């Protein structure tokens, strides 16, 4: 009945086969009676398999339909293919006759006879079938008919059929040898036959395993037979040839032509191996990447001919192909485990036989093994070796064919065990063969590229294990991508067993064709598990899937055998492997601990997880588990000895990363607050692991607490500055990295911390501080960034960092944590507070004297901002006035040198809503980016600088994919309020030049002496104040005192750059200096623009100059003409000061105020101003600064009279002469070198350089002329000022234009 059922199935699959009656070309006997079925069947290996799958029914159907269906063209084609064609036709004819004679007997006998005949015929007829798949089908059908006829004849005359079977073997082998090349070519071309898809698949399988095509055929026939005999019909689809072999075995069992079938199958396998061999030799594919890649870097395994790996794909990359013998990973492991493999194979056979006995009749089971053994024996003589055991691995048969001939018997036995195993578990076998068969068939369709396609499917088997499809119940029958799950070279049972790494990467259930492998692996795993786990049987407590974990302690093959279900067996296998790895699992939900595998077996465990239960989630695959299971595959088992330690480590690190990331995506931690990794629910954790975990936890707590205490203490110190915070926090983080790398993850901490423990960032020194919400010692263990949670009572209330990440409970210690990217927000990243700290309007005053109102702007405090930022921002008015200035003018020097960072951001400015963004915010940002502008405002002595985010590093230029505005605060550079800050500093002497020297440049030596004495008395304190002010712009006292000035004055003092030519006039300012109690009034007067300059009459009232202690107030009416900050003012003293002290002291103070300018040009101009100042004094006091016969220069200007004579005309012709002298004179540098000066040149010098000490009239004239000349000079210099304007602002708000050219002379003077 089983045969008939099989036959019917095969008929359903191959009802199209056609056969023509004829005589055997070898023995001239009817094909039905002759066993020589070399007719074109060799070309159709697929036909064999399909015929085998459809043996009984096909035979009957063929007898019915062969005459009608078989086109003559096919017969002709067979004939044209030499003996194979004629034999095929003869076989078809004879088989047709025999079938017509005994249709029913054919059905019964057909299974064995057809399988045998088809095997032989397929071997012989491969070339003809390669010509056309129709031919293959016809030949297959003919073979089936012949087989059926042979079976009938055998029934009539069993001896004759046996003899003919022997003859057929010899004839087929001869024909195959003769037509080997033709068969190969025909095999390549045999795909077009529509009905021969299975045939092609079979062929491809055989081709893939050329070394043992014979064995493959036998094993496949056996497997098919088992499948057919078993209720599952998938086996028939998978490998008809296997079914044929099994049927042949059954026939033998029944006493029917078993010998002939075995011989035929062996012959067919040989021919198939021949045909496939050619194709296989053409392609060498890397087992790892699945591509030919660089052939010069492709290392070929010397142990197994099919093993190949690129040097750059190897676990340990090599620079060049190794010389001499090189063993692939599988072969290397096989060498160590050959003995174990043999034992496993025997046990596997027993197990599978026992298991399959429940599903098949005992006699059939025995017959199948016998047939398999016979076929194996016949196939052992197969001359060809499988070059593509990987491809063969897709099919049970071929998976074992990659073994060396030395292991050929073992392989055959393995295949037999696999066949019995498949017969035992029809569903399981059908599925793996299905996946394999489908792949193999697809590859066979393109026989020229079987390996390449297979490799494509099996690309990176080790890497793809983590990406394999989620668990598919093999019983359900879902097709698995075997190529992905299985390593390309695990085709051999020995290879698969030997290479545990690849087998591990493969699910233990990857193939039931490879279940022998899995059993072997299980056995190895059991042994290793026994060694590593030290007889610790850990029960898996998966609440949802008891069946998955019910085989917790079943490490014996007996338990596996007793278990009648393959799923349970595979589960047991996975459990055993897991037990060996001692992976801890949190019980809960549907999560099975089986999914947890050591790093070395992550792949296999993943496959197991996928195959075992759909409900189980494989965290190794990057899929989040139900909160109970922490990173299952991410648990390093360093103590577990593995041959593949490095591989497992690499895979583990990858899996760890993926699992951590997956877990970080929202895996809720189901553990309770007090629950740790050692909870009773955790299974598979060894005592050593538990102790290690405890120790690590203790160390972690101690180290973190210590660090937290130290950091908190440091933070409390006032000197704990921003930079120190950075350095210390960085150092602590680094230290944390070392310690936390061996600390457990959040699963060791209460889940309460996981959920509630959010990293908070306080603003201390501009850097974030992580705060625990409750317990200061509860610290979030960040995998990559070891962030300390600083418990401190003095810190600012923390703000939540977005987003909040909850880690999955991880068991046990994650030693590779440093490799895992931290999903927590980095401490150094600046994030705007969710709540805005200020909301209002920005009034932007543009450079072109226009203003624009931008409403709906709100400021958000940065998480890295200093606490003082909040204080300042709280004082922001609702409408904040800002100046639009070029960015470069306000760009801090720190940014120029070091660049900008996220940590520099103090405020984020955003629009409050979409409408405000479109109307106001976006245009403002675009304009600033386009024109490289910045916004500058000041408040409370602090400048607010706002820039566009395009100036930030590229990784933080956008927020929500949009550019934004960010602000920083900068202390304003101000003069000391104790100084005469109300007066323009542009009118004073440079601070870095000694007033004595300045006097020397403009007065005789005696006057210098007098001036020196006055300076010593008056400027000691003043200079000291000035010097202090030069270095104390950041002094808070300075800021506070400067705040007393009017806001407009503040703006003038601010460090903003004014465009050249823009006149900045100080408003009326009243200031008081605590030091000298000098009170000055600067009255703003009408501006007079003369070529860009302004004349400001300034009235200065002073009482009690500080140094001299003089209480007489000074009232000075000063005419300051200026066009820019550089413009030299002309001072006019309205009241005669005290002869020596008042006037000179006043001059000194003014000069001292100019120090902050720090520019030579300014210095020179202030000297002019000071000279004019002194000239305004009366009597001897004013004469101090006048020109005398003795000059300051190294040269001696003796012609004072001449100079005076020349100066006198200035008073007569002020306009003409003055202009002529000023415009025509250039600085005569020869004067500094001691050369004679001409009248013109001397006059060109400032008037204070030429003064006669003898003539008071001349001094008065020179004073008047100097005033006029100064006015003229200012007018002329207004044009030159713009190019030399400095980008500095001073307490004096006036802008001075370029220096007079004659003043360059002073630069060369010695000092």
From Swiss-Prot:
Keywords: Coiled coil, Metal-binding, Transcription, Transcription regulation, Zinc, Zinc-finger. Expressed ubiquitously. PROSITE patterns: ZF_PHD_2. InterPro entries: AIPP2-like_SPOC, PHD1-3/5-6, Znf_FYVE_PHD, Znf_PHD, Znf_PHD-finger, Znf_RING/FYVE/PHD. GO terms for molecular function: histone binding; histone H3K27me3 reader activity; zinc ion binding. It comes from the Eukaryota. Pfam families: PHD (PF00628), SPOC_AIPP2 (PF23121). Part of the BAH-PHD bivalent histone reader complex that contains AIPP2, PAIPP2 and AIPP3/BDT1; the BAH-PHD module associates with CPL2 to form the BAH-PHD-CPL2 complex (BPC) for transcriptional repression. Binds directly to AIPP3/BDT1 and CPL2, but not to AIPP2. This is Protein PARALOG OF AIPP2. It comes from Arabidopsis thaliana (Mouse-ear cress).
């Amino acid at each position: 009945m089983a045969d008939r059922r099989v036959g019917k199935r095969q008929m359903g699959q191959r009802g199209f086969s056609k056969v023509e009656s004829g005589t055997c070309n070898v023995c001239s006997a009817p094909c039905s009676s002759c066993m020589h079925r070399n007719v074109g069947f060799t070309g159709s290996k697929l036909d064999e398999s399909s015929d085998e799958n459809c043996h009984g029914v096909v035979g009957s159907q063929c007898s019915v339909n062969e005459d009608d269906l078989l086109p003559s063209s096919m017969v002709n084609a067979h004939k044209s293919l030499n003996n194979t064609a004629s034999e095929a036709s003869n076989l078809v004819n004879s088989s047709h006759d025999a079938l017509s004679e005994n249709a029913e007997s054919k059905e019964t006998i057909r299974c064995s006879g057809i399988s045998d005949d088809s095997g032989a015929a397929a071997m012989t007829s491969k070339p003809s079938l390669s010509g056309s798949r129709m031919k293959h089908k016809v030949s297959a059908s003919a073979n089936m008919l012949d087989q059926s006829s042979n079976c009938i004849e055998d029934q009539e005359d069993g001896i004759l059929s046996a003899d003919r079977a022997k003859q057929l073997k010899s004839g087929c082998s001869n024909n195959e040898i003769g037509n080997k090349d033709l068969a190969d070519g025909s095999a390549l071309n045999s795909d077009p036959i529509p009905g021969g898809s299975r045939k092609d698949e079979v062929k491809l399988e055989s081709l893939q395993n050329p070394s043992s095509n014979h064995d493959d055929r036998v094993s496949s026939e056996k497997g098919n037979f088992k499948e057919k005999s078993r209720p599952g019909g998938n086996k028939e689809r998978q490998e008809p040839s296997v079914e044929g072999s099994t049927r042949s075995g059954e026939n033998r069992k029944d006493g029917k032509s078993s010998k002939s079938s075995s011989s035929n199958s062996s012959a067919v396998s040989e021919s198939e191996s021949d045909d496939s061999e050619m194709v296989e030799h053409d392609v060498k594919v890397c087992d790892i990447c699945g591509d030919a890649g660089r052939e010069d870097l492709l290392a070929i395994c010397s142990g197994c001919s099919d093993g190949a790996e690129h040097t750059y794909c190897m676990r340990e990359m090599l620079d060049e192909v190794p010389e001499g013998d090189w063993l692939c990973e599988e072969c290397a492991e096989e060498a160590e485990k050959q003995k174990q493999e043999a034992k496993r194979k025997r046990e596997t056979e027993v197990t599978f036989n026992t298991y399959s006995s429940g599903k098949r009749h005992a006699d059939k089971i025995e017959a199948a093994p016998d047939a398999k053994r016979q076929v194996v024996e016949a196939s052992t003589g197969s001359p060809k070796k499988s070059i593509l055991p990987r491809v063969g691995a897709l099919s049970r048969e071929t998976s074992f064919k990659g073994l060396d001939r030395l292991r050929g018997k073992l392989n055959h036995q393995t295949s037999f065990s696999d066949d019995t195993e498949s017969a035992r578990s029809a569903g399981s076998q059908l599925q793996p063969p299905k996946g394999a068969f489908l792949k193999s068939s697809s590859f066979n369709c393109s026989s020229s590229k079987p390996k390449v396609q297979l490799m494509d499917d099996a690309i990176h088997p080790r890497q793809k294990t983590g990406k394999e499809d989620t668990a598919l119940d093999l019983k359900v029958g879902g097709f698995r991508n075997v190529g992905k799950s299985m390593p390309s070279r695990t085709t051999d049972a020995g290879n698969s067993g030997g290479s545990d790494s690849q087998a591990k990467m493969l699910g233990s259930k990857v193939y039931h064709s490879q279940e022998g492998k899995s059993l072997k692996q299980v056995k190895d795993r059991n042994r290793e598990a026994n060694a590593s786990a030290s007889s610790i049987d850990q029960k898996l407590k998966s609440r949802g899937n008891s069946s998955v974990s019910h085989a917790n302690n079943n490490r014996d093959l007996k338990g596996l055998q007793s278990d009648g279900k393959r799923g349970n067996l595979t589960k047991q296998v996975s459990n055993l492997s897991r037990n060996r790895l001692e992976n801890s699992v949190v019980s809960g939900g549907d999560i099975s601990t089986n999914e947890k595998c050591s790093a070395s077996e992550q792949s296999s465990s993943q496959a197991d997880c996928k195959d075992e239960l759909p409900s189980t989630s494989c965290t190794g695959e990057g899929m989040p588990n139900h909160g109970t299971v922490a990173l299952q595959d991410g648990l390093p088992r360093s103590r577990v000895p593995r041959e593949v330690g490095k591989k497992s480590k690499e895979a583990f690190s990858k899996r760890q990363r993926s699992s951590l990331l997956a877990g970080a995506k929202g895996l809720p931690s189901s553990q309770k607050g007090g629950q740790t990794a050692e909870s009773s629910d955790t299974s598979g954790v060894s005592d050593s692991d538990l102790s290690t975990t405890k120790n690590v936890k203790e160390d972690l707590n101690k180290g973190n607490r210590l660090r937290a205490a130290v950091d908190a203490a440091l933070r409390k110190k006032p000197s704990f500055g921003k930079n120190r915070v950075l350095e210390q926090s960085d150092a602590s983080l680094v230290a944390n990295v070392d310690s936390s790398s061996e600390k457990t993850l959040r699963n060791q901490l209460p889940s309460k911390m996981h959920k509630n423990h959010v990293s908070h960032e306080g603003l201390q020194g501009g850097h974030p501080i992580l705060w625990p919400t409750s317990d200061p010692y509860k610290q979030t263990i960040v995998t990559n960034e070891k962030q300390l949670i600083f418990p401190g009572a003095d810190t600012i209330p923390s703000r939540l960092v977005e987003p909040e990440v909850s880690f999955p409970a991880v068991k046990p210690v994650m030693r590779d944590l440093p490799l895992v990217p931290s999903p927590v927000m980095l401490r150094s990243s600046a994030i705007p507070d969710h709540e805005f700290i200020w909301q209002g309007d920005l009034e932007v005053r543009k450079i072109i004297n226009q203003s624009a109102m931008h409403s709906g702007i709100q400021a958000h405090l940065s998480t890295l901002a200093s606490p003082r930022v909040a204080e300042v921002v709280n004082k922001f008015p609702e409408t904040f006035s800002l100046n639009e200035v070029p960015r470069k003018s306000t760009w801090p020097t720190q940014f120029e040198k070091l660049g900008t960072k996220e940590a520099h951001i103090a405020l984020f400015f955003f629009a409050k809503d979409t409408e405000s963004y479109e109307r106001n915010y976006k245009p403002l940002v675009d304009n600033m980016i386009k024109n490289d502008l910045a916004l500058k405002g000041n408040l409370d002595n602090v400048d607010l600088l706002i820039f566009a985010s395009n100036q930030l590093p590229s990784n933080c230029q956008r927020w929500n994919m949009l550019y934004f505005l960010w602000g920083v605060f900068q202390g304003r550079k101000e003069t000391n309020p104790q100084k005469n800050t109300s007066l323009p500093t542009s009118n004073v002497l440079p601070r870095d030049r000694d007033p004595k020297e300045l006097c020397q440049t403009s007065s005789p030596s005696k006057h210098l002496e007098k001036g020196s004495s006055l300076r010593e008395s008056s400027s000691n304190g003043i200079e000291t104040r000035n010097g202090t002010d030069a270095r104390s712009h950041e002094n808070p006292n300075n800021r506070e005192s400067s705040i007393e000035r009017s806001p407009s004055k503040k703006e003038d003092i601010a460090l903003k750059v004014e465009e050249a030519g823009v006149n900045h006039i100080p408003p009326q300012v009243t200031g008081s200096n605590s030091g000298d109690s000098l009170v000055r009034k600067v009255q703003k007067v009408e501006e007079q623009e003369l070529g860009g300059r302004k004349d400001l009459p300034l009235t200065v009232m002073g009482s009690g100059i500080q140094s001299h202690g003089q209480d007489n107030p000074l009232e000075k009416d000063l005419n300051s003409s200026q066009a820019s900050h550089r413009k030299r003012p002309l001072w006019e003293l309205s009241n005669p000061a005290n002869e020596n002290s008042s006037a000179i002291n006043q001059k000194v103070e003014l000069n001292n105020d100019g120090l902050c300018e720090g520019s030579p040009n300014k210095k020179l101009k202030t000297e002019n101003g000071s000279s004019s100042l002194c000239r305004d004094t009366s009597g001897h006091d004013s004469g101090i600064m006048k020109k005398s016969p003795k000059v300051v220069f190294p040269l001696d200007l003796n012609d004072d009279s001449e100079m005076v004579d020349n100066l006198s005309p200035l008073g007569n012709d002020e306009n003409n002469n003055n202009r002529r002298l000023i415009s025509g004179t250039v600085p005569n540098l020869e004067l500094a070198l001691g050369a004679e000066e001409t009248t013109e040149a001397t006059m060109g010098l400032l008037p204070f350089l030429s003064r006669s000490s003898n003539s008071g009239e001349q001094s008065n004239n020179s004073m008047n002329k100097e005033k006029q000349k100064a006015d003229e000079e200012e007018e002329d210099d207004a044009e030159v000022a713009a190019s030399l304007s400095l980008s500095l602002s001073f307490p004096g708000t006036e802008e001075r234009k370029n220096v007079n050219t004659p003043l360059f002379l002073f630069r060369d003077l010695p000092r």
